[in-house]
Amino acid sequence: MPDLANTPARSERAMLLILAGIQFCHILDFMIMMPLGPFLISALGISTHEFALLVASYSFSAAVAGLLMAPVVDRFERKRFLLGIFLAFAVATLLCALAPGFVTLLIARGLAGIFGGMMGAMVHTIVADAIPFERRAKATGLVATAFSVSSIAGVPLSLLMADAMGWQAPFLLIALLSAGLIWFGYKALPEFHGHLNSRHQGRAIRQMIAVAIEPNHMKAMLLTALVIFGGFTVIPYITLYAIANVGIAADQIPLIYFLGGAATLLTARLIGALADRLGKVIMFRVVAIAACVPVLLVTNIGSVSLMAWLAITTLFFILVSGRMVPLLAIVGAAVKPQERGAFLSLNATVQSMAMGLASMLGGLFITEAPDGLISGYGWVGLVAASFNVLAALWVSRVAIRD
């Protein structure tokens, strides 16, 4: 395993930028599905229920991928494994663009979810392997800017392309970007062998179970689930609530993504730097508790001006996504290096399952009134805020082993 602590800063930054690009591709691939809903429903002649299956197939496939990946991931060199699954992801995304109907698109989305879920876990594994703990939160913040760039440029550009060339265009764009990044990754990413020298012998399934049931690992995975429930109970229904209750026009929705993404592009690295300076646990608690404010505002505000709504949603983006920066550093340090790949694969499974379950939990509270307004969203906000408080209390139980 290379010691990037002593390599030139330029090499380390190049590695982090490539990893951020890989994150951008699979995050955009996931994010774009919900705003593409009207295009897909019209073009494929599907129902809203079938569209929901298209969205859910990615998360649940990613969860399955984590289970499949965990027993074997630490037996492979990191760079080759990442680029291999990235290539498979690019092919699956290309199949999405070529899908002629609902069933084939559903299968392609499932495949994209499998490899996209693996990619996310492997990116964070490499960051945890390569960057010393005292600088890891800042590095994680740089990689996390992939979410911001997806929101600022990826989603608006994809919607413009879909409007001009059809719903297939965004998937073609992602496949082409992935192909370019695979080449850059092959040229610039270092190889990682350190975990291979200290891997445990024995059956893969037995090793995975041992990693999964280790008490500190379970505490870290529970922390991840609490954080996801603290945001994803709310996130899937923001657009619906904005249009029905706040009075935001449909063509103004991209502004939410653009401004929120632009803000997090700046704040993710700031939060990471503060976490390195003040402490990951302290910074996580501050951001998680602060996130309760925009969570409750977004779900209870009612009809307000566009400017007021954008201010609230931008704060929501900053703090809800900002929790992930110290969280990923804490979770990555909760495991020994030789078990990190397997653990983060399992943690990715927990994250994907939590996303699906959280969105379903939020849906249990939400109903559409006869006048078209959305009711029950305020209760969703209270539930999400409660999970954030629980996460802030629970984080100190996770032991740092790096």
Regions of interest found by a model, annotated:
Residues 2-9, 190-222:
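Juxtamembrane intracellular "pre-TM" segments in multi-pass secondary transporters
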Residues 33-34, 217-258:
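Extracytoplasmic gate region of multi-pass secondary transporters
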Residues 64-103:
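Conserved MFS/SLC helix-loop-helix module at the cytosolic interface between two early adjacent transmembrane helices
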Residues 66-77, 267-279, 366:
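Helix-to-loop junctions at the C-terminal end of transmembrane segments
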Residues 108-149:
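Cytoplasmic helix-loop-helix junction between adjacent transmembrane helices
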Residues 142-189:
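Helix-loop-helix hairpin linking two adjacent transmembrane segments in secondary transporters
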Residues 163-175, 364-386:
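A membrane-interface helix-boundary motif in multi-pass transporters
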Residues 281-327:
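C-terminal transmembrane helical hairpin of 12-TM major facilitator-type secondary transporters
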